[in-house]
C-alpha cells in the first residue's frame, strides 16, 4: 500500500532545556512539517510513504531531504528549486507557560511553487491514499491551486483522500481558510479536525465545551462530525479531543464517525505528561491512515490512532518514532511504561 502526502518541510529551531527565546544562546536544528510528519509515521509502520514538496538544491534543502530518507520515506518526487527552506522557531512551554511558535517561511521554495512544478498523474500512479492538511494551502493562492490539482488528480486515479483541517491563524484569516478549504474538502473522503478547527474554518462548534478550562462535552462532537460529513459528504470524520490542564499535562482522546454505519466510536482517554506536543496531531493522522488502510474496525482504528499520538507526545522532535507493535501494545491496554528486557 502506498501513501502520498504533500506539504512544507521546515527547519525547526528550538532552545535547549525549556529555555525561552530571549535567554537561549544556542538552538537545536531539526526538521518537521505536518504532512512530512505523517509520512514518517507511515514509513515507520512499514508502508510505502512518499512526501511531495519543493526544496532548494543547496545543502540545507538536502539536509531536509535526508531527514526523511533516514526513516524510509520516498523523496523521489520532491521538486528541487527555489532559494529558501521555511523555518519555524519553537519555544517549548512547561506547566502554566504555553509553548510559542514563530514562523519564518515567507518566500520558501514551496510557497513560491507553481502547479506546473508537479506531475500529479505520474505521482499518483499506483497510490492508495493521499493526505494533506490545511496548513499547506494557507501558504498562498498558488499553493491552494497546487492542492486543488493534486486532489483532482487523486480522485481521477481512484485514490482515497484525507485532510486534517489544521487551522493556523498566523498564516491566514478564517475567511481565507473557509473559502479555500470549502473548495478542497469537496474532494476529501476522511476529515480530521479538533475542538477548534471545525469552528475556526467552518463555524461549527460543540456546545458546553471549554478547551482551556479542560472541559469537553464529548457528546457534542457527534453533532460537529455529522455537520461536517453532511456538508461535504465525507465517509469518515475524526475529532481529536484535547483537555489542556496545562502545557505539561493534557487529557487526550478522539472520536471517529463512520457515515455508512452511522457509528460514533470514542477512544479511551490518556492522561499525558508531555515531552513534546508538536506533531501530536500528525501522529494521530498517520495512525488513522494506517489503521483504515489495514481494515481495522471503526473502534480499533480510533484506538490505534490515539495510542500512536499519545506515544508521540513522549518523543522529542516532530517525527513519531514508534512501531506498529508498540502502538498496538498501548492500544490494547498496556500503558505501564515498564522496561522491556
Regions found by a protein language model. Give the residues of each.
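Conserved phosphate/ATP/ADP-binding segment of small-molecule kinases
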Residues: 171-260
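Beta-barrel outer-membrane channel/assembly domains of diderm bacteria
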Residues: 9-15, 37-44
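Positively charged, low-complexity intrinsically disordered leader regions
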Residues: 1-20
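A short helix->loop->beta-strand "cap" motif at the edges of active sites that frequently abuts
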Residues: 155-160, 232-235
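Alpha-helix C-terminal capping segments
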Residues: 30, 38-48, 291-294
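Conserved N-terminal subdomain of the carbohydrate kinase-like
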Residues: 48-137, 327-341
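Short catalytic helix/loop segments, enriched in acidic residues and glycine
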Residues: 20-39
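Conserved post-catalytic alpha-helical subdomain immediately downstream of the catalytic base
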Residues: 264-334
Amino acid at each position: 500500500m502506498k501513501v502520498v502526502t504533500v506539504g512544507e518541510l521546515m527547519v525547526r529551531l528550538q532552545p535547549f532545556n525549556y529555555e525561552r527565546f530571549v535567554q537561549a544562546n544556542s538552538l537545536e536544528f531539526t526538521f518537521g512539517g505536518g504532512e512530512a510528519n505523517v509520512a514518517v509515521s507511515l514509513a515507520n509502520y512499514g508502508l510505502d510513504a512518499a512526501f511531495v514538496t519543493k526544496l532548494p538544491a543547496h545543502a540545507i534543502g538536502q539536509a531536509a531531504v535526508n531527514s526523511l530518507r533516514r526513516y524510509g520515506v520516498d523523496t523521489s518526487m520532491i521538486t528541487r528549486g527555489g532559494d529558501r527552506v521555511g523555518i519555524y522557531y519553537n519555544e517549548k512551554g512547561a506547566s502554566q507557560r504555553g509553548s510559542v511558535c514563530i514562523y519564518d517561511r515567507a518566500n520558501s521554495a514551496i510557497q513560491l511553487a507553481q502547479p506546473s512544478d508537479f506531475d500529479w498523474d505520474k505521482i499518483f500512479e499506483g497510490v492508495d491514499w493521499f493526505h494533506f492538511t490545511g496548513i499547506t494551502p494557507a501558504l498562498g493562492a498558488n499553493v491552494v491551486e497546487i492542492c486543488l490539482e493534486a486532489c483532482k488528480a487523486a480522485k481521477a486515479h481512484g485514490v482515497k483522500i484525507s485532510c486534517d483541517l489544521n487551522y493556523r491563524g498566523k498564516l491566514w484569516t478564517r475567511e481565507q481558510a473557509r473559502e479555500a478549504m470549502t473548495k478542497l474538502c469537496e474532494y476529501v473522503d476522511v476529515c480530521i479536525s479538533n475542538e477548534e478547527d471545525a469552528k475556526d474554518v467552518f463555524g461549527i462548534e460543540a456546545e458546553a465545551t471549554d478547551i482551556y478550562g479542560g472541559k469537553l462535552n464529548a457528546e457534542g462532537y457527534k453533532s460537529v462530525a455529522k455537520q461536517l460529513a453532511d456538508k461535504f459528504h465525507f465517509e469518515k470524520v475524526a475529532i481529536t479531543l484535547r483537555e489542556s490542564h496545562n502545557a505539561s499535562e493534557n487529557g487526550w482522546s478522539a472520536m471517529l464517525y463512520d457515515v455508512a454505519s452511522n457509528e460514533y466510536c470514542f477512544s479511551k482517554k490518556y492522561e499525558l505528561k508531555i515531552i513534546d506536543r508538536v506533531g501530536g496531531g500528525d501522529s494521530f493522522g498517520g495512525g488513522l491512515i494506517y489503521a483504515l488502510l489495514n481494515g481495522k474496525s471503526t473502534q480499533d482504528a480510533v484506538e490505534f490512532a490515539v495510542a500512536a499520538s499519545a506515544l508521540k507526545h513522549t518523543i522529542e522532535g516532530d517525527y513519531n518514532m514508534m512501531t506498529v507493535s508498540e502502538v498496538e501494545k498501548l492500544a490494547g491496554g498496556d500503558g505501564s511504561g515498564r522496561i522491556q528486557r
